[in-house]
Curated annotation (Swiss-Prot):
It is a single-pass membrane protein. Keywords: Cell membrane, Membrane, Methanogenesis, Methyltransferase, One-carbon metabolism, Transferase, Translocase, Transmembrane, Transmembrane helix. It catalyses: 5-methyl-5,6,7,8-tetrahydromethanopterin + coenzyme M + 2 Na(+)(in) = 5,6,7,8-tetrahydromethanopterin + methyl-coenzyme M + 2 Na(+)(out). The chain crosses the membrane at residues 48-68. This is Tetrahydromethanopterin S-methyltransferase subunit G. The lineage of its organism: Archaea, Methanobacteriati, Methanobacteriota, Stenosarchaea group, Methanomicrobia. Its EC number is 7.2.1.4. Its main location: membrane.
Length: 72
């Protein structure tokens, strides 16, 4: 072997057909990846919302306890 990569000769029509099919497969893979990322984002957003709600609820409760203890 003289260090060169082997060359293959393909008809241009066949090559273009294969490239179109690869583009379609690539589009499908990108679509699925984006759907998965969107679902993960929704789950993370829900979890963050629950945490913020808990923290705000706890702060409101502590403020209520502080204020109610001042008037006793």
């Amino acid at each position: 072997m003289d260090g060169k990569a082997p060359a293959a000769f393909v008809e241009p029509g066949e090559f273009n057909e294969v490239m179109k099919r690869l583009d379609q497969i690539d589009e499908k893979v990108e679509f699925v990846n984006s759907e998965v990322a969107q679902r993960i984002g929704k789950k993370v957003g829900r979890d963050i919302g629950i945490l913020y709600g808990g923290v705000i609820g706890l702060l409101l409760f502590l403020i209520y306890v502080q204020i109610s203890s001042m008037f006793m």
